[in-house]
Amino acid sequence: MGSQVNDVEEVVQAWYMDDDDNAEEDQRLPHRRQPDDLLPLAKLLDLGLVAMRLDADNHEHDENLKIMREQRGYLHMDIVELTPEKMPNYEVMIKRFFEEHLHTDEEVRYCLDGSGYFDVRDENDKWVRVSVRKGALIVVPAGIYHRFTLDTNNYIKTMRLFSGGPDWTAYNRPHDHLPERKKYLEALHNRTPRFGQLHRIRSKME
């Protein structure tokens, strides 16, 4: 299991963000605390996230991706690129993505190229920044407050996976009354074990 975690940590890293809420600060900077200790992947799993590494160069024929999609019921997908060259309203859009929100379904993103940051709230409402690079697949659970931004490379190509028709509705904070939010908080407070879930997925893929 240790080697699997190390493989994932090459493309997924996480740390607590600094407390600088200055609107003038570039959201695309790392915003690490000092000292900038990395968090173990188990912390992400405790928060309900799933992180794994797949072969991005072979995504069209990757049996591991196929198995993972079958196991989790991801029947549909599309591929999007975020970059100033392909989005005339790029700066407006990344500001919109950076607004704190939640979804009523899990958000699944597979980084095929480039890089970016997912920020998620921990159990004490602190921001955890999750860096994803090529090969990283991350599942953000329904009901968790989060946001997304590109980093200073200003480019990411992602596969979006979903089980039903795509519903990108974002509920900006506060939306604590939603059932999905209540279910997430219940699972978080009960410390529902998730590391085993990741292990089962990976063991069936190998």
From Swiss-Prot:
GO cellular component terms, semicolon-separated: cytoplasm; nucleus
- Identify the residues that bind Ni(2+): 101, 103, 107, 146
What pathway, per the record? Amino-acid biosynthesis; L-methionine biosynthesis via salvage pathway; L-methionine from S-methyl-5-thio-alpha-D-ribose 1-phosphate: step 5/6
One biological process term in Gene Ontology: methionine metabolic process
Indicate yes or no for the key word Metal-binding: yes
The entry's keywords: Amino-acid biosynthesis, Cytoplasm, Dioxygenase, Iron, Metal-binding, Methionine biosynthesis, Nickel, Nucleus, Oxidoreductase
List the subcellular locations.
Cytoplasm; Nucleus
Reply yes or no: does the keyword Phosphoprotein apply.
Answer: no
Catalysis: reaction(s):
1,2-dihydroxy-5-(methylsulfanyl)pent-1-en-3-one + O2 = 4-methylsulfanyl-2-oxobutanoate + formate + 2 H(+); 1,2-dihydroxy-5-(methylsulfanyl)pent-1-en-3-one + O2 = 3-(methylsulfanyl)propanoate + CO + formate + 2 H(+)
Note on cofactor? Binds either 1 Fe or Ni cation per monomer. Iron-binding promotes an acireductone dioxygenase reaction producing 2-keto-4-methylthiobutyrate, while nickel-binding promotes an acireductone dioxygenase reaction producing 3-(methylsulfanyl)propanoate.
Job of this protein: Catalyzes 2 different reactions between oxygen and the acireductone 1,2-dihydroxy-3-keto-5-methylthiopentene (DHK-MTPene) depending upon the metal bound in the active site. Fe-containing acireductone dioxygenase (Fe-ARD) produces formate and 2-keto-4-methylthiobutyrate (KMTB), the alpha-ketoacid precursor of methionine in the methionine recycle pathway. Ni-containing acireductone dioxygenase (Ni-ARD) produces methylthiopropionate, carbon monoxide and formate, and does not lie on the methionine recycle pathway.
PANTHER family under this entry? ACIREDUCTONE DIOXYGENASE, ACIREDUCTONE DIOXYGENASE 3
Question: What's the protein here called?
Answer: Acireductone dioxygenase 3
Q: Could you tell me which species this protein originates from?
A: Oryza sativa subsp. japonica (Rice)
Phylogenetic placement of the source organism: Eukaryota, Viridiplantae, Streptophyta, Embryophyta, Tracheophyta
